[in-house]
Each structure stands twice: as C-alpha cells, then as structure tokens.
C-alpha cells in the first residue's frame, strides 16, 4: 500500500474533474462532522496495489531459431518466411501484441508444413507443441505487458466520472468480448485480424477503465468504512434534534448523490469485471505479482478490493438502518 503522491493530492484540492467524486464524498463527511456528536474526517488517500513493472508481468517464451540449411529447406512452406520475420531486425524488438500474432502464425505454419527430414520434422513438432502450451502466456503478454495495459490499469487517472453510465462503455465491452473469444479459442489457433486486435488494445488504453474503477472502489470503501466506524458509537442519546440533523445530511449527501453513483458503478463493474477476470484466467499462468494484482478485481475472492467494497457498502447501510431504527425514524434510499 502506497500513500498517493502530490500529483493526486493537488488534483483533489483543485478543479480537476477526475477527482470530482472526492469532493462529493468529503462533503458527506463534512456535513456529518458539523454535529457536535461525531468527529469524522476524510480518510487518508492510500493506493491499492498498482500494475507490476514490465519485468514482473512479462512471461518468458521459447525462442525459435533455425540454421541456414534448415531455413533453406523450409522455404517450400511458410515456416521459413514466418521465422524469418521474427529473426529480422524489427522482429527482434516486436511488441508483445505482435509477438502473440507471430506465435499463432509459426505454430500454424509448422503444423501445416510437409517436412521431408524426419529429424527436422520431429524438432519442429516439439517446438510447435511447446509453443501451444505457451500460447496463454503469449496472449497474456499481449494484453498486460504493453503501453495499453499501463494506461488501462493506471491509478493516476482518478475516479470514474460522477455521471458515468453503462452506455459509455459499449465500445469497451465489445473489445473485451472479442479478446475473450480469442483467448477462449487458443487451442484452435484462431485467425486474428491484426488491425482489429491492436484496435481493441487501443480501446482498453483509451478507456482507462480498470485503474479508474480500482481507484474509485478503494476511495468509496475508505469513506464508507470511516462513516460506519464513526456512527457505530452513537446510541439513543442522539435521538431527537441531533438525529434529525444526521438524517438530513444522510439524505442530502448519501441518498441523493453517493448512493446513485455507487449504483452506476456497480452496474458498470458487473458488466466489465466478469470479462476482465476471464482474460486473467485465459492468460494463466500469470506471474506471482500479476496474480496478486489481478486478485483485486475478483468478484468472489473474500480479500479482493471488490469484495471489501461490497462489505463496506452493506455495513454502511446496516449501521445507518440500525441507528434510524433505534430512534424510530424511517428514511428512504437504503437497500
């Protein structure tokens, strides 16, 4: 866990719309804090785990090198051509997205080539088998080891917008669905349109969705837990005018602003996270660092950021309901 630096803090205190939600949340706690019965401050900004560095998320793949004589004997089929593409100057520095497409091409070329030399045929057959086993890792490298993933998972872009809705993520959903189809058919060596594949990675990058969601639910959790802990100590002595004030603040800040925003975030995440988690699974085995990072998005793991956010939301609702019930007051908006 890392305390967020000066850039984010400056954004929160300024007019940066990426942190508009922070103002809404701090107004909620500030409103409660004006009562003499509680002291609740905005929680410190503490970051969730960030995307691991490239060397901690890239999986090593088997290199395929052929000698000159073998290369000449393979010119009768596509193996020599495809292998030559990888061994070129540009091929040696190809990005992971292109390396994934190359892996598909070289396996397809080897398995379709009629090789006269039994020794060479056995060698290439072994290489193709090994590369088939590594395809999920090549796929994961393409998804999670480029500049696109760094933007997609970046925590420096703030919250999902206050007015965010599922209507704004259709392009992202389409891209994720296409990527899942590819990952789910690796054993069949899918024919992948390079321009569409690269375009889908660009869509992920431009959306900045995963990092924004992770930052959003982390801050929501912090605020909800802070409020829940504060009102947990209140008893019937605050019933009457003080409780009337709390009800007013709760309804004007939480029911009218925070809760609807959380509802939009939940609907959005329940569309995206199943696909994102599927992509993590289709890219297995991930590095230890990537497994730890990806676990934050799990819909089911008890220690995920998502589950902690859900528990914070439920406890917040339960605590307010208990307090209103204690003072025989009814209130709208809880679910």
Annotate each PLM feature.
Residues 18-41, 203-335:
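A cross-kingdom marker for long, charged
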Residues 28, 68, 86, 106, ...:
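Generic structural signal of hydrophobic/aromatic residues within well-ordered alpha-helices
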Residues 16, 23, 65, 70, ...:
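Acidic-enriched, low-complexity/disordered segments with a strong bias for Aspartate over Glutamate
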